[in-house]
Regions:
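Short, internal active-site loops enriched in acidic
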Residues: 34, 61-62, 95, 351-357
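Domain-start "cap" segments at the beginnings of catalytic or binding domains
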Residues: 8-29, 269-305
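A generic secondary-structure signal
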Residues: 41, 45, 49, 77-81, ...
Length: 370
């Protein structure tokens, strides 16, 4: 993060990813609603508290590639709450792709309606160079390649490019993108500052989660990009002062709900660079903000010492009662509050040890319901 105490903020961007709207986790409608309400709260915070001039969303706006009408309607309602002068710049993630080949995706649909700007790279025309079409508000088409944002006090634009999910082909696509950005800037003029939206994991950044892209494959991209806005990995990570991955707004499994997983969004304040003594450069200050999400809490119970179902049930109830104060304390953290009250947690119930009676008498559903 670059800290610039005396610089003047010219533009504020916010960066969120992996909203997964429509995800009915565990088959629960409440979790589907959580995805929407957490994203809504983040958008509202970006606008009212961060004063964002544009929202960056690199992939997985949706959870399901084939949307139910209700989910599409909810997404449109949330996008309509965002002021018209705050563009929502979106690239495609793996969950946003169609299950079957079609010419038009739901991102194309929202782009054509003016609710988002869908950015993607044309990678098929030239195997060495990506092609990027400028966004035209009068003729938006089905997508655009880049979007220019005017910043106060700067003659050149802030330019945002998009690269769609490419999976194992991401490394090759990034080489095409690096060349394509150079050619685009020669054709349309050099920008003051450059953002690339992309959806992939980086090797070794988050151990055990894997990644399809190496730092070596990003070397050419770094020469032409100032801020790589990533999505795909649901855990926050940053690298090299130019790579940022905010973590999904909501945790999508018990592992993601652990305390060592940060979830949220970034605000990026662009400034004139005067605090560094270089008035001709663009400086930037990046802050991470936790999203207001539903907490997870793990309860572990060792069954080994109980010789009958009734003894186990009594001990289990006492154990859960003993955990109540800790649960309340955990859920009272600021990121788990809704309207001033703690949100009810998702309980991750783990039974451990060796059962001393018939497994058929071990009624886990009844214990979980209690």
């Amino acid at each position: 993060m670059t800290t610039l105490q005396e610089s003047i903020t010219m533009l504020t961007l916010t960066h969120i990813a992996d909203t997964h709207l429509g995800h009915r986790q565990y088959g629960l409608k409440q979790r589907e609603d959580d995805m929407v309400s957490t994203t809504r709260a983040a958008f509202q915070e970006m606008i009212e508290e961060r004063g964002t001039d544009a929202i960056l969303l690199p992939g997985d706006l949706f959870h399901s590639r084939d949307l139910r009408p209700k989910i599409l309607h909810q997404i449109e309602q949330e996008l309509e709450r965002i002021p018209d002068d705050v563009p929502v710049l979106v690239s495609r993630g793996n969950h946003d792709e169609n299950l079957t080949p079609r010419d038009v995706t739901w991102l194309n649909y929202l782009h054509q309606r003016g609710q988002i700007v869908f950015l993607e790279s044309e990678l098929k025309a030239n195997e060495d160079t990506a092609w990027f079409n400028p966004y035209d508000p009068d003729e938006p088409g089905q997508s655009a390649g880049f979007y220019d944002i005017d910043a106060e006090g700067v003659e050149k634009p802030i330019r945002v490019f998009g690269l769609q999910w490419r999976g194992a082909k991401s490394g090759l696509a990034l080489q095409q993108v690096a060349e394509g950005i150079k050619e685009t800037n020669e054709m349309h003029g050099e920008p003051a500052w450059t953002v690339l939206l992309a959806h992939f994991g980086i090797e070794d950044e988050v151990p055990t989660l894997g990644g399809t892209v190496t730092h070596g494959e990003l070397r050419d991209v770094k020469d032409v990009v100032d801020y790589l806005a990533l999505g795909h990995i649901h855990k926050r990570y940053e690298s090299g002062g130019w790579i940022y991955n905010p973590g999904s707004p909501e945790a999508h499994n018990t592992r993601e709900g652990r305390a060592d997983w940060d979830h949220g969004y970034y605000s990026i304040a662009l400034n004139d660079g005067s605090a560094e003594g270089n008035s001709s450069s663009i400086g930037f200050d990046v802050d991470h903000h936790p999203t207001k999400r539903r907490p997870y809490y793990q309860i572990a119970f060792d069954v080994t010492e109980y010789e009958s179902p009734s003894n186990l049930e009594t001990a289990f109830r006492e154990h859960v009662q003993d955990e109540q104060a800790a649960i309340t304390d955990h859920c009272s953290q600021s990121e788990f509050m809704a309207g001033g009250d703690p949100r009810a947690p998702i309980i991750d119930l783990r039974f451990t040890g060796t059962l001393q009676f018939s497994r058929g008498d071990f009624r886990t559903d009844e214990l979980a319901a209690w």
